[in-house]
């Protein structure tokens, strides 16, 4: 009852839904207000504090682009490349909530949750902007921010066409 088919497209016989994906869009929701979102509590991280959005946006700019995201990967034994491209990290604030939309060519194990924890640490002034840039160089999971809870995270869309842009998908 939570999943619905919104579109059907004919694909080649050798198409693989995971291997042929060219990108993904994830949304992470954070409650920052004093009033609890009772009916949404399973789908939103109740952070309970209001971080500095301007600092978080500046940190997001540092993380956008093609980088080695090993510091943001929970799998310490990752054998494959940890280089990924984040096309955009969009932060919006509305009614006691922060919504972060991540668009990229692929994401590592717990990468979105670790990125979110790191952005929140910056927003709470527990981490400097310069330390965010250093995380891309040191490639050490222990240096990055906390892993935000899974309940705020939603896979919004899987992209398949190299021509498909975020503006066409939302």
Predicted regions and their residues:
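Structured-RNA-binding interfaces characteristic of tRNA pseudouridine synthases
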Residues: 1-170
């Amino acid at each position: 009852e939570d999943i619905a088919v919104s579109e059907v497209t004919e694909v080649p016989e050798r198409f693989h839904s995971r291997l042929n994906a060219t990108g993904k869009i994830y949304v992470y929701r954070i409650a920052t207000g004093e009033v609890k979102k009772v009916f949404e509590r399973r789908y939103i991280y109740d952070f309970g504090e209001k971080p500095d959005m301007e600092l978080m946006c500046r940190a997001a700019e540092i993380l956008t682009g093609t980088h080695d995201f090993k510091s943001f990967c929970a799998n310490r034994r990752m054998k494959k490349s940890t280089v990924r491209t984040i096309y955009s990290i969009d932060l919006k604030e509305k009614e006691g909530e922060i919504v972060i939309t991540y668009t990229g060519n692929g994401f590592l194990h717990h990468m979105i949750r670790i990125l979110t924890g790191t952005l929140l640490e910056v927003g709470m002034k527990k981490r400097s902007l310069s330390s965010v840039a250093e995380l891309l160089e040191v490639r050490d999971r222990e240096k990055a921010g906390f892993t935000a809870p899974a309940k705020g995270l939603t896979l919004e869309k899987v992209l398949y066409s190299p021509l498909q842009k975020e503006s066409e998908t939302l």
